[in-house]
Amino acid sequence: MESINVVNSVEDLPGFNPDENVEENMEVVESVKNDLEMSDDEELELSLDLTGDSMFTPPPSKRKREELSDSMKQRVNYYAIADMRMKDECLDYIKNSTYANEGWTEEMTKEFLINQSMTMKLYLETPCDADKLREYLHSSFSDSEVFGIINMANVGDAGTGKTRCMINFQSSMPGMCITGPENKTTIHYSEEYMNRNQPGCRRFEKSTCTWHKFLNLMFANTTMQIQLKKLQDDEELNKETESFVNDVSMLGSPEELRKRTRELTLLYMVKLRNIMTTVYDQMKYNFTKEKMEIYRPMYDNDSPMNQDDKMTFTWVNNDFSASLKRLNTAIAMAEQRLFGGAGQPSGEIKVSKTLEKILKKQISDLKEERRLLILRHALSKNIKTQEEYRNYVSFMTSEKRAKFAGGPDLPPMTVIYEIVMAEEDGKTPLYMKFLHSMISTVANMIYNPPYYKIRPPIYFTSGSDTQFGSISSTASPLSYILSPAIKSDEKHTMVWRGQLFRRGLDDMSSDIAKAHRVPCLRLENNLPLDESILKLWERHSTLLGDPDYHPESVRIFATHNSINQFTNKMKDSGRADLYVNDLAMISSNVVPLEGSILSSGGINSKNGINTIELSTKSETEAKKARCLAWKKKMVIYSNKIKKRVKNENKPEETKLEIKPRKVVVKGVPMDANRIIPSSEEYIDRRTGGGKECAEVNIGYTRYSEALDVEMAKTLERLNMDYKKDLAIAYGSKEAVEAEEKMLKENEDMDGLALLKTKNVNKRAKMVVESISSCKTGSRKRKHEDIVKEHEAEKRDSDDEDDFEEVDVEDTYSPTKNITTMMYITGPAKELLSKDEHIEHRMYAGNIEKKLGQGKTYAKQVFTSARATDHLGIFEYVPEGDMVTIYGNVDVKAYDKDDMATFYKSVEKNISGVVMHMTFKRPRAFTSNRKVDMIRNNMTLIPRGVESTPMMMRMDGAYNNGSIASMEMKFLVNMEIVFEFLKEKIMYHMQTLIHNKMDDGELTDIFNQLFEYDGSSEMKLVANGYREAMKHCKNENKKEKGKKMGVEDLYKDSICWINCIQMLDMNFFENRKLTIYLHKSPLYDIFKYASEKSVSISANDVTFKSTIIGNYRHEALFHVVDKAIGFKPDFKKNGCGFGYEFKEEDNLDQKDRHKGDHMAMEWAMKHVYPELFYSTSAVVKYGDVMIMSSEPKMENPINWTELFCSEERKQWGKHGGSNEAFGVLARRFQAPPSTPDTILFNQKYRLPIGEGVGFPRPFRQGAGPKNSGVILKSKNKVLYYASNAAEFTDMGYDKKQAKAESGYALGMVCPFTISEAFTFHHAQGSTLAGGVFIDLGKLKNGNGELIHGMGGTSSAVLVGITRPTEVSNVKLANVEEFKKAYDKEAQTKDWARTLAKKRIISSVSTRFEKFKS
């Protein structure tokens, strides 16, 4: 048979024309299909998707050739014609929606844009109210819009193919982008669109996948959240919006429509002004300070694309000639000041070194700004269309990333794309549309994209009009556009409606499909709900509520509380038996404002105080323990530095020499490895990349001549070759010699501060293979080098994302004075006396009760709306009491071995004592069930694989280099080879194989068996495996020429796997292997590189994980077991042997901020490893990889929110007090608004000491006069002193501590169950399995509908349309629900409401276009 060319789509077929009708194209497809010659054993299957695209794919097994059914052909025709018609008409509509087609001349367009710009400038830059705003509001663009905006909508009920239709349409519209109300819907759409049209492209849309990110609303800001919440609850706004949407009196009266639209727009502008000014200020800052001005084309004054000064803001640079002249003048003045004299620069610097540095940096920045200005001007000459502007933005993005750090990477999306499509599904509030209109106007005024003068922006919404009522807002943009008044402006509004249902159904004319459509049609057409059809899918409620009944099906509930009841049933029935903890660590400073002490220990309590793991030490014993702990930890706080010097006997090794160093509190040892920068680091700095380039302490920039001279000298001293392409070529021998020469020339290691000021102080890796090969001629490295490199990578990869860079002052001083926060952390029972421990533990029971099931806690630590779906009751863990003692001990006394003075300073200079009590919340999971993420991102660590070798080849996650490292896959391949050899040996010599045989014995037996009669491929596998094992175990050190790098080993292992595939296909396809990395004999060599943590985003729609265990799982317990082995013995060694200090020491060496959560994480990890790792879950990521979640202490939690429940907040609205808890603090504590740059290294350093001597229990006014102790809650302050100053009189001149950041900490498992969720979460999803709905759960205990009539109807419609197959719907309590529904309908006059909706729909239907 002749070879057949693979056809990727029907468009590749000869004779196929997408512009012809579907019947003719189907004939082409059928003719090609019939012409193919197919064997009897294997045929090619023609798979047609719903859009008309096709692909020839080989079938997985033998099957008879089947013709497409008539119903399938009919559906393909219907949908293809409908989509094609909509696409063509929408393209024509968009093409004609220009100012010119409005009948406007160029002068009229310019006048409108100027007036619109003047409105925005007055609106944003001057105070205004409704009357003043009404006075200067510009004339309306159209009857339906005040601002220049075009409205489009793709509306259809659930399952009508809106998303697929929009993807087909966007394929023809490069100027269109996507956003929406939530990540889930938007990212799913983007991934599907990219996979079909632009694989690997448009990844930036993930950064703007929600309206808050798209419009840069800074939703993380608490003030912004409050303002948005007020908008949703604004009664005036909701009343006017509802009146406008439901008003049909404006039909046929354009004047009335224009008037009402202006009034509604004015109201929204007044309500949104605070938000708009915040966004405007941020846009102005980005443009002027973050170099975002490079995205604004710089046209000549006579260019037709040039923008009139009245159309933009005064702070926008609009004149190229004037800007260039200004920069030239500034450069000349700076150079004249630097060199002195009134004439030309003489070349001799006349200023001080400090001013010289400032002036050189200023000149460098000005020259760079001038270069970019000239570049912008040159590129702008070629910008005539929006597509050319997008190319310009792409080019300038590369320039910005290379030259400047920080700030956004792209201008606002509304500038790049003239069309924004919103996947709404009824979850977007209407004010987002008005924000989009105004922010688009402001952004266009600033960046001047070409389309700004040609056409208005287009707002394209997609969703179901029967679901928009489910949000907590009166109207959505979709309902606004679908209102009769807006739709009547057909020139500026286009609405498409689809009515076909579920494209995935095989037979739309089947009885079950028709029956399923009856309740859907009634709800979609605003008719009363009829329970007769719903009873077809009814099951008994006890069945649907039983977790063991069809456990693979999904339950949908109305409330989060119902979900928790279901999860409790899962736990009680034993189905959920896999427990993972969430931890909350609460400071003993948190105390109740009133109330008695609650017990937290049951029978193990005395006077309400839990006695389990309570300290038994006296005050003297506790002081002695603290002194010993401080002494042990001084190993990293001492004023000593580790200096690396050459050992004459072993040139390749080094020894340590102690040398004193000047410090303020602590001198951070400079890592001796930070001498020679790697080539990548050097090139990154020379080209301006990296975060350091934007910081003040970088010294000279790469454009400074002085830096070039100094760097050339440094490179020459290091024996490096500086080439034109900025590459560094040096061999390993030359590098060692250069390093030794450097050490000899710099006996005083502080001389290396010069390199630090030049930003080349980072620890260098071993020579990069590809660069060192230019001198050595070999790409292979020593095994010792590989091991050193992996260990070095481990030291430098300790959770860098959680650390903040410290702003240190740039200096040329040969010494570096560094202060740091010094503390000891350990179990409270070991470092506190019994009385002290009792005082700190006093309110554990009160806090335990307050935490409850952790609803408020979940909202603080999780980002998903499903945060409260999976709860558990918090329990106090008395053995988890951890105390942190801060101090300013006498370091000099310790250095002089004056222990008496040192021990006195330990007690005298204590500046803080904070005890954190640990509370755990067990959550139960079901083994081998899918789990979902409830955070924006999480970190997973690879632990092994479980699959066949064939599945490993096909799994996307395993073959993703960013998830599975080369070292990991090499270990896995070696284990596959071993299992293959073992299986072959056992087949031939089962009597000789014993479990005690190691891999060496097995391979020796195998070689004896197959030395003569084995195949060449078998010998290759055996020999390669043996050589690799010897190499990695250093058994061939003396054999020259066989030194391999990990890349070579990995490539060879792939060859061995290929041989196995050829030798034994059954083993390769069917043998399921479970391989754990830690069981590999090579694990110790590659453990750091093979188990690199991987960051997983919730936006990744390919995320698919199945939970298989907790910390006791075999894949993770070896880590816990090892940690237990390193657990410090406080009774014998104080704070242990120093192993637990390595993270803190590593952070100090990098000059980074140590937060409370970091300190607590380090302590918990080494003192209580089992409790620490109990928050980890072991999951199967994808179909192959076994991974564990990385335990990580959360950033400090807002304690005021954690201890102020929703119930108390609601009570506070009605006049009650929402104060329940407060914190013990000092009067002169720094306020929360104090920046960290002021607080760093002065934390807790109050005159008396934060946390020292706090009275427990606290009694208001009972303390001594002038006491500085207070009890501060969210809104008030209680004074311990009887004559304390008022709160407003408290001074904040002593900004020594921001203790509040460490009052509440958390460590969580980032997963939740997937067995149940709410209707709101289900909206917009399509479920492949069963969907169970207990309609009785839609009403509360009083028999009233929870979501009202409209919300309940939408919930039912959402639920019954989620599954791909209608037979998968199962309902319960239909009749009970219908009784409550009818009762509510009579009370609310629901029939009249539905009739009104039907009238509105019938009146406005004539303004819609139908796809079917």
Swiss-Prot record:
The keyword Coiled coil is annotated on this UniProt entry: yes
Biased composition (Basic and acidic residues): 783-797
Keyword Coiled coil: yes
Ranges of biased composition (kind: Acidic residues): 798-808
Superkingdom in the source lineage: Viruses
Keywords: Coiled coil
Ranges in coiled-coil conformation: 317-377, 732-800
Residues covered by region (Disordered): 1-22, 778-808
Protein name: Uncharacterized protein ORF47
